[in-house]
Amino acid sequence: METVISRFLRYVSFDTQSNEESETCPSTEKQRALGKALVEEMLALGITDAHMDENGYVYGTVPGDPSKPVVGLIAHMDTAPDASGAQVKAKIVPFDGSDICLNEEKQLYLRQADYPELAQHIGKRLIVTDGTTLLGADDKAGVAEIMSAAAALLHSDKPHATLKIGFTPDEEIGRGADLFDVEKFAADYAYTVDGGLIGELEYENFNAAGAKVVCNGLSIHPGSAKDKMVNAQLIAMEFQSMLPQAQRPEHTEGYEGFIHLTGMEGSVEHASLHYIIRDHDMEKFQQKKQLMTAAAAFLNEKYGAGTVELTLKDSYFNMLEKIQPVMYIVERAKNAMEHEGITPIVVPIRGGTDGARLSFMGLPCPNLCTGGANFHGRYEYIPVEDMERITKMLVTLLCEAE
């Protein structure tokens, strides 16, 4: 039987980077190549209903005991636009605590001094990059772990819940749940396998919104600008200065939310600012949006109506309110982890997942660990042993479901 590691190494050879500038689904055709390969592999395993729909979503079913609930496992096929996912050259390195040379020519090293959490992996084998690309453990590790768990269930005589498999495109650009067919998926509940270090279990995420601020100025020759020119760029700077410095991402952690300036461009006539707003607490989330609204109103009163145009758009919400009524699904995940000797680490997601959106679409969906770390960059890694244990944990989760 193929191992979770061999699957993972095969999957990362596919370049599946998504593209937020594209309006198609999937956003890049190359994601379909992995989807097609997964369908072929699922059919070969005996998952007879495996298919990819017109939007690049992959579905399949491992039938189980009809007296047990129907449980979904979901992962995403795309990798982040932040770093190249083409021609990934993954390698397995025994880790003894010493610096790991990723690329001798570029003098790139994965060092415990830079990433202290590496200390917990001494004695394990780490899958790393050659320093020129990301690895793709986010989330091809999740895909490999789900596929390997499905294969194990198909070869097991032990009673287990029916498993519904879902692989999504475009999660990294926030669209993974957009066209997910919850009704066709027909699971009682599900888990995304898209988390980090082994043991992480997440059922809280940010409430999220985007904001666009457009500042309108008046250009005139600077030689005759006195009492006439209105510089939109300076108004944009004034708007930014009215937001609390302590609520920037670089100053926050845990349950602390933030207002993050993600982009800006401008001239004397027009300037624009782009923000993302995040907070786990709905009241604080609304306060952040109200603060931006108040700043825009103040500047319009100061410089004249229409000087500042603010557009706010909610993106997703904290899944906690949808998980709390069914907390037994979190307890089942904890029990499966403990059964495999994994200590559950419940942490808030400082971001979002497909599961957050799916929870509001009627499919409660906490997030489980993959084992990986340093996602979206050249220092991404994942321990072999942790992938193997997580695969066993997923099997236990399906077998122990009641």
Can you annotate each of these PLM segments?
Residues 100, 124-137, 170-293, 297, ...:
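Midchain, well-structured core segments that form catalytic/ion-binding scaffolds
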Residues 49-54, 262-265, 347-348:
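Short beta-strand
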Residues 147-154, 238-245, 396-399:
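Short glycine/serine- and small hydrophobic-enriched flexible loop segments
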Residues 234-251, 258-260, 307, 317-365:
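Active-site-adjacent substrate-binding region
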Residues 23-68, 72-74, 78:
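A non-catalytic alpha/beta surface segment that caps or lines the substrate-entry region
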